[in-house]
Every structure is written in structure tokens, then in C-alpha cells.
């Protein structure tokens, strides 16, 4: 499949829809080192992710089926699924698998690359640069992602955001381990991060 060049101010090509049209557990580790880029110039390298496997995963929002809240997750791959949590935070996922699968990848942390002034302005005063995007709620705030971005197409680059491949491969020595902040499915090793990266949100996962 031919890749179109991204309109975002970061060199590389937009990741095609076929990349996302696979199991979330396959997509998640391969998202590491890709770029989440916004049309306004903000961009960060993806350094931590978690996979959620729909009906096979008791921790997934889609485990018990489709609802108005999680409907986007059952849509076509390569879109944002953005949800509100704890009554105060937004989190963003990339929808994966075929239409109707209800699976996706939570982006947990970014290494800020571009548009840091905008990120700082979007976060609380005196936030350290290391903490701008270190955690799923922090990164959505820093990148300007909220409920209005639920369902945004990440492939077309016409709706403000894209996942960009700038040529940096996923790490060969992947760290994998339990996901964070869930009450069920803790035994599933579906969290991956870039080893040694200081922007990872928690302790490095272990296999």
C-alpha cells in the first residue's frame, strides 16, 4: 500500500491503515518509536503503549460489547478512540483490527520532539519537560487531544493528527510486562516501552 506524505511538520510518511488492521498485540510493540504528530506542530515519539484485545480481554472497554461510549473502538482501524476517565482526564488509543473487532492500543507516553512551547502552555505551570507527555492523561493534555478528537482518522492527515514513520525502527530488545492501573487482566504482558527511555510513565516492564 502506498503511503502518503504527512502534512505534519515532521519528516516521514504516514503509517497506512493496513498497519493497524491487525491484532492490537501485534500493532502495539511496532508503534514504539513512531511519531504522533499534530497539524499545529506538536509532535512526540511514542515510547510506551498498552494493547487491549476486546472480547478476549477483561480490562478492555469493549469486553462486554458495544456501547455509545466505546462505539469508536468497534470502527475501522487507524482512528483515534478517545475516552474520559476518572472524571477529569482524556486518554487516546489507536483503533486496531478489522472493523468491529473492538481492539486498540493505548498510547501511554511520548518523548516530546516539537512544539514544546505549546505543550508547556497546555500543561500546569512549572511542569518539567520530562513530565509533559509522561503518562496517558498528560500526553493528551500536552498534545491538545480531547473528546472532540474521538474518531479522528490518523491515516488521512486531514483531521489534525497522524502517526508518522520517520525511519526509526521499534527497539529490538522490547520490554514487555503487565499493564498499569487496571483491576483485571493484570497477568497479560501487554505493555511495552522503549528500554531506558526517561519519558516512560512507570517502571520499565519486565517479561
Swiss-Prot record:
For this UniProt record, give its keywords in alphabetical order, as a comma-separated list. DNA damage, DNA repair, Hydrolase
Q: Which CDD domains match?
A: AAG
- Organism from which the protein derives: Burkholderia orbicola (strain MC0-3)
Q: What class of enzyme is it?
A: hydrolase
Q: Which HAMAP family match?
A: 3MGH
Q: Which SUPFAM superfamilies match?
A: FMT C-terminal domain-like
Q: Which GO terms describe its biological process?
A: base-excision repair
Query: Family per UniProt?
Result: Belongs to the DNA glycosylase MPG family.
The molecular function terms in GO held by this entry are: alkylbase DNA N-glycosylase activity; DNA binding
Tell me its EC number(s), please. 3.2.2.-
Q: What is this protein called?
A: Putative 3-methyladenine DNA glycosylase
Amino acid at each position: 500500500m502506498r503511503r502518503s506524505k504527512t502534512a505534519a511538520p515532521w519528516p516521514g510518511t504516514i503509517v497506512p491503515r493496513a498497519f493497524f488492521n491487525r491484532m492490537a498485540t501485534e500493532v502495539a510493540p511496532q508503534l514504539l518509536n513512531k511519531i504522533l504528530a499534530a497539524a499545529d506542530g506538536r509532535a512526540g515519539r511514542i515510547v510506551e503503549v498498552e494493547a487491549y484485545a476486546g472480547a478476549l480481554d477483561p480490562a478492555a472497554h469493549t469486553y462486554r460489547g458495544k456501547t455509545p461510549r466505546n462505539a469508536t473502538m468497534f470502527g475501522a482501524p487507524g482512528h483515534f478512540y478517545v475516552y474520559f476517565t476518572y472524571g477529569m482526564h482524556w486518554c487516546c488509543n489507536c483503533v486496531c483490527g478489522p472493523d468491529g473487532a473492538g481492539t486498540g492500543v493505548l498510547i501511554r507516553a511520548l518523548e516530546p520532539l516539537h512544539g514544546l512551547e505549546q505543550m508547556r502552555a497546555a500543561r500546569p505551570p512549572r511542569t518539567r519537560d520530562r513530565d509533559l507527555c509522561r503518562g496517558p492523561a498528560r500526553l493528551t493534555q500536552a498534545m491538545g487531544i480531547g473528546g472532540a478528537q474521538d474518531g479522528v482518522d490518523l491515516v488521512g492527515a486531514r483531521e489534525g493528527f497522524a502517526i508518522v514513520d520517520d525511519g526509526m525502527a521499534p527497539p529490538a530488545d522490547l520490554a514487555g510486562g503487565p499493564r498499569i492501573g487496571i483491576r483485571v487482566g493484570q497477568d497479560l504482558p501487554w505493555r511495552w516501552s522503549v528500554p531506558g527511555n526517561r519519558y516512560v510513565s512507570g517502571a520499565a516492564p519486565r517479561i
